[in-house]
Structures are given as C-alpha cells and as structure tokens.
Amino acid sequence: MGEKMQFTELDQYLFGQGTHYDIYKKLGAHPTTQHRKKGVYFAVWAPNARYVSVIGDFNNWDNQANPMNRVGEIGVYEIFVPGAKVGDLYKFFIVGYHGEELYKADPYANEAELRPGTASRITDITDYKWKDTTWMKKRPEFDEKREPMAIYEVHPGSWKKHPAENEDDPGFYNYREFAHELAAYVKEMGYTHVELMGIAEHPFDGSWGYQVTGYYAPTSRYGTAQDFKYMVDYLHRNKIGVILDWVPAHFPKDAHGLANFDGTAVYEHEDRRQGEHPGGGTKIYNYGRPEVKNFLIANALYWIEECHVDGLRVDAVASMLYLDYGKKDGEWVANKYGDNKNLEAIEFFKHLNTVVLGRNHGTVMIAEESTAWPQVTGKAEDNGLGFSLKWNMGWMNDFLEYMKLDPYFRKGDHNKMTFSMTYAYSERYVLVISHDEVVHLKCSMLNKMPGYPDDKFKNLKAAYAFMIFHPGKKLLFMGQDFGQLREWSEERELDWYLLKEDNHKDLQNFVKTLFHMYKKYPALYAGDNDPEGFEWINADDADRSIFSLVRKSPTKRNNLLFVVNYTPVERPDYRVGVPKKKQYKLIMDEHGLLDKPKVFKAEAQECDHREFSFAYPLPAYGIAVFTY
C-alpha cells in the first residue's frame, strides 16, 4: 500500500476508547484509489495474530501474496491491494497466537458469499443513491411516546416464496421485489412499521438469523447490500418504518466467524464461564473490552445511519443483564460486588442507547427483556438502560393463557386480563404476539383459541380487539392477521391460499379495520404512557367474562368506550356505566365498522359505580366500540 497509512493515530485512539462510532468506514474492505491505481483498502483487528494477509479472487487465494501491515499497538492490520474490485470474494488468513492457521470472514464486511459459502464480498457502501429524503427529513420529529406504532414482524425468507426450480432452490424473493409486495400489503393492512428478522448474515437458515457471523452485511440470501438499501428506501417512500432484529447477546462458534478470531478470545471472554452459553452453543461478547463495544455500537449506527433503518429490536437483553442467565452454580462468575448483575453489559446498554438515540432523533431502540429488570426504558442518566420501548412479555403470557381457556372457565382467571394494568406505566411497552409464540408446538394464534372453527375466529377477533385497546404499541407476527393454521416454519411460505376462505378473509378485514382505527384515534396511542389516558369501567365482571374500559384522547375529543364479551353467551340487555351523561356512538362491533353509527343516550341509572349508564345488546363473543 505504499507509505500511506489509512488507520491513523486518531483512529487507534478512538477505537481503543471504544468511541470510534464510524469505525466501519475504516475497518473492512473499501474500494479506493492510491497512486492513481484503483483497488481496495483492507483493515482488520487481530491484536494477537502473528501474521495476517488478505486472500481472495484478486490473488488466487494465495496467503503469501498480500501480507498486511500492523498499525501501532492496537493490533489493526491494513493493506491496499491494487486490482481488487467490487464483487470479489475475500477472507483474512491469520496465523494465530499459538501458530494455528485461520481463515476468517471479515467482521466488518458489508456483503457476504451466499451460504454455504463463508467468504466476504467486496462492495461499495457509498454507491447507493437514496430517494427517501422526505422520510429522513421528517424522521427526527417522530416521537414514539405520542405516535402510533403498529409493527408487522416479518421473516423475509418465508413470507412469500417463488415456486422452486429444483430441490436446492429455496425460492427466496430478492429484497427489491420483496419490498414492493411487502409495502403494498403493509399499507393495506394499516401497519406503520415492519420488523425484519434474520437480516444480518448468518450461516444456518434454522437459526432464523439469531446466530450472526456478518453483523455489517445484509444476508445475501435475498440479494446484495444495494438491494437491501433499495428495500429500506422503497418502504420509506411508502411511509413505512423499518426496524431490524439485532443480536448483540451472543455469536456462533463457526470457524469463519468471530470466535477465537486470532487464536485467542478477541470478541468473547477468555474464561468459558463468562464467554460461553451453557451447552457450548454460542459465545458471549466481552462487553468490557472497548474495541468489542465499539464493534457493536458502531454496528447499530451502521444500520441506522448508513442503511437508514429506523430502529433496532435488541434480542435477548435478559441474557446479557444476568451473569447467571441459564447457568448453574459453578458455570458463572459473580461481579465485583458478589452478585449476578453484568455490570459491563449494563454500561454497554447505557452507552449504546445514549449514542444511537442521541445521534438519531426519531429512531427507536426496543428491548426484548423477559424479566422484571427495573428502568429498562428509564433514562441512562437516571440509572436506566435508556431504551425507547420494551416488549411486554408479562402481558403476552397472561393474555395468551386467558385466551386459550375454554370460555366457561375464563372467570377463574379473569385477573390475567387486568393484572397488566398494575404495571402498565412502569415502562414504555410494546404489546407483542411474535414469532416465538407460533412455533415449537405452541400452535398458531388461531389454533390457540378454544372451540369449533367458528368459535376460534370469534375468539381471535375479540383477542385482537383487546390488544388494540390496551395501552402499548402493537406487534403482530406475519400470518396471524389472517388466521394462519399451521405453525410458522422458516422453510415454507405462509398459507396465503387460506384467504380464499371466507372466515380467513373476514378475520383479515377485521384486523385491517382495527389497525386503521388505531391510527385514526389518538385516544388509542397518544396516552399510552399517561395513566389519565386509560380507565376501567368494569374490570371485575368475572362471572360474565366481560371487560369494559375507556381510552381517552389528550384533546378530550373522540374518546373511546370498549366492551368485549369472552363467552358464547349473549347478553341482550347489557348495561354499562359511563363517565358522562352524553351520547355514545357505536362505530364498530364484532363484524367490523358500522355503515351508520348507532347512538345510545346515557341515562341517570347507576351502574359500575357510576351515576350514568346505558343498555344495549351484547352478542356472544361481542365487541363494541363507542365514541363520545
């Protein structure tokens, strides 16, 4: 590469501090020109390596052709290779600390070879011309605390598939064609965001993308890095936000990956009790090492700033917070205070969220955290973790347990539907029905419901209606909005043919109506984090398994009264207490929106500990939405 050193002393200093937030512009492979020669600048961090070279299509994979130069004490190796070009495959050949020969994919690669290949591919991340200027200019104004979020969770490889040309053809859609079909569906259904699973490169389809080897590379299953950017771009131009699953909790042991990168524990802890999950499946990052923190934080920024992604859903946060997560005595090491809190991971989250959200207003960081860890969405300066939102796993578990019950036994578990309101304002929550709930013999949402087929559809409508009216953002996994019967499998597409059947099409239309109503009425989202925005009318009608509640708009206009009946018993003269002596317009029932609202006048008759009430016929599995 001549005398020109690209990884400067400032780069070394910032990387060593863990604060080189655009490190991905230096490490990795970057097409450039030096001494009037076109080529590629390569740089890799391998602090304990004895020898490093870059090998690839450009040098016939000769591990002696392009030895790299070590830069300073931090352990970065760099080289400029004339003639290397976009599209070439490459790896780093490393002679490790103990003399072993290692062939590693580039941790900072922006594109990868299609599996089962494990090489990295040279690409130019500056080469895409974005057209989402309107979205990106408005993005800083987005405030998840006061705006609707209806998230459609999608696994791109199994949403839809092309007919296979042969037994080895998985039938994947390219990112570009996927974008067009997905945008049309999401807009029609009323979702505001998509949350995409399995985007970062991973070797094994069956991991669903949760065992990542290419953190900076959109998986090549669906196309190139440019194709991925087009997908984000197109979704933005259709006013759809994009959230990615992000997996900083662990990484796999694959030989080409991060594990034992230079013959030593570079990215993971050296002590297996700290650096490995039980059973030997995956490695745990060393969150206390500045260069490792830098790798992860810069990766979050890469997706958000370079790829225009609007947020990250951070996987398995609980496994990072607890040193003994999933471990037995003797399998973990206590912190300096003698307890099980992972102090380095806690500081990592505070640092991550402060930097990402501080630099990118209008984006969201969402924690999948399954315990009662306090202040997950609290401010980092107040000793919180600094996330924007947290998945509400407690609500989900109680809600699903209740809905699975035979209606005649629901009265015994009535509190499962009300308990969540005792902690609803302790965090900023997303109500989730995710992929995890429709796999591993847990049944699809429709088949969780009790009764005959007609009963299942009625129960599921009532379930989704309650979800919309409960405080919190919403997330629904693909297929559950039209009543997918089979459990989800990454190997096949959704059973779209079911939409030819009336029950499934009717359910889909009902869910569509719910989400469009959710976006239309600020009462359903603007007060999610304000106790004044919600009021139970009757949370105690266990004998009849009926719930009634009010969602209030900050403007005091277009408040909503919601009543739902979770039994097949009709209540022809059901009386509900109301907050005020006003007219209440029935705008939606279990069939959908009414063509013409029905008006009910409150009268001076005490009910539900309120001075005023009115009566109306509540059908079996009935749903009623009134405005006032």
Features from the language model and the residues they span:
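A short acidic, glycine-rich active-site loop
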Residues: A217-R221, K336-L343, Y452-D454, L498-K505
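Short glycine-biased active-site loop of nucleotidyltransferases that positions the nucleotide triphosphate
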Residues: N69, F204-G209, K253-N260, T377, ...
